[in-house]
């Protein structure tokens, strides 16, 4: 979302970029059901903060913490701390969002940087502190299955939805979309 929001607007800004982002996230149908027409502000809110979206970033952190509490004894201290810290920080972002309304680009950038760091923190703590037993390998398998699924969705959206018919493959818009 952070890079997509910074794409040059010389291409007409039809909103297809955000529609394709919702589609790649598997959230387009739910978005249309709850919100309707696709626009940047609503798409960002739906993907990041909307509690009606079960796959929003905030809901994912909430569910991760709930699940971690259920299996607390199977987690290392570092793993628990990383999940709990992410949950507490997310609550701070939600409280600030409730006071100010729609999130501005600077705060969105901070939020997405925080999410990236929290994800890397958990992944690093899991990789470095877990015993190499079935639980470790099962969690790694889950990571790779999710990666493969997301990669397949992105490739599908990129070549079937995003690039306008008038734009050449390998052109400037194609370049900006791939780097976003």
Give the ranges of each region predicted by the language model:
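Alpha-helical transmembrane segments and their helix-helix packing motifs
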Residues: 1-180
């Amino acid at each position: 979302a952070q890079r997509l929001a910074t794409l040059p607007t010389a291409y007409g800004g039809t909103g297809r970029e955000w529609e394709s982002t919702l589609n790649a996230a598997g959230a387009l149908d739910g978005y249309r059901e709850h919100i309707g027409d696709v626009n940047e502000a609503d798409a960002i809110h739906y993907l990041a903060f909307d509690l009606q979206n079960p796959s929003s970033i905030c809901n994912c952190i909430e569910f991760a913490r709930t699940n971690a509490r259920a299996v607390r004894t199977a987690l290392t201290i570092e793993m628990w701390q990383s999940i709990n810290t992410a949950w507490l920080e997310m609550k701070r972002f939600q409280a600030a969002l409730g006071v100010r309304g729609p999130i501005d680009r600077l705060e969105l950038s901070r939020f997405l940087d925080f999410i990236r760091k929290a994800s890397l923190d958990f992944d690093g703590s899991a990789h470095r502190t877990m015993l190499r037993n079935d639980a470790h390998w099962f969690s790694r398998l889950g990571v790779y299955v999710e990666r493969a699924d997301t990669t397949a969705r992105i490739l599908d959206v990129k070549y079937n939805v995003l690039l306008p018919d008038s734009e050449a493959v390998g052109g400037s818009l194609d370049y900006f979309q791939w780097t976003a």
